[in-house]
Amino acid sequence: MPSFDVVSEVDLMEVENAFNQARKEIAQRFDFKGTHTELERDKEQNVLIRAGSEGRAEAALQVLMEKLAKRGVALESLDPQKLEPASGGHVRQLVKLKRGLKIEDARKIVAKVKESGIKVQAAIQGDAVRVTGKKRDDLQAAIHAIRAAAFPIPLQFQNFRD
């Protein structure tokens, strides 16, 4: 029986490359000279922006987002937190990466597939939604219906099997 999986993943190698490019650009750009603006990564692959002012922190976030977009990483996978004051009159901002389907999002996807009226079944399996059907055309229609719903998270369709 044909099936496919709906997942929400981020290519961590592309994030790493974009992070390094953004860090180099911030170190070399004239408008960032002397502002003590820097990017750091933690173990959970989140990005911490430290800057001397809110404007420089926002500009650093824009540089990071630009580099991620050029590398093909969906910007919906970023979750920038609020700017918070740090020591020495600086500010910092944590940018979290959204990875994996949350249960609420998976339920919304299943509900969208069911309300579309296509003859397929959707089931939540861990951090993925498996959609099965009798015909390949039904599965392609389900993919189209999910894409048309415009969920606020980046979705990928994997393991399309006949």
Swiss-Prot record:
Q: Which UniProt keywords apply?
A: Nucleotide-binding
Which CDD domains has this protein been placed in? YajQ_like
A GO CC annotation recorded here is:
cytosol
A Pfam family that this protein carries is DUF520
- Indicate the transmembrane segments per the record: none
> Is Nucleotide-binding one of the keywords UniProt gives this record?
yes
In terms of domain of life, where is this protein from? Bacteria
* Keyword Nucleotide-binding applies: yes
Function (record text):
Nucleotide-binding protein.
Q: Which NCBIfam families match?
A: PRK05412.1
Family (UniProt): Belongs to the YajQ family.
For this protein, the record's PANTHER family field holds: UPF0234 PROTEIN YAJQ (PTHR30476:SF0)
The name this protein carries in UniProt is Nucleotide-binding protein AnaeK_0101
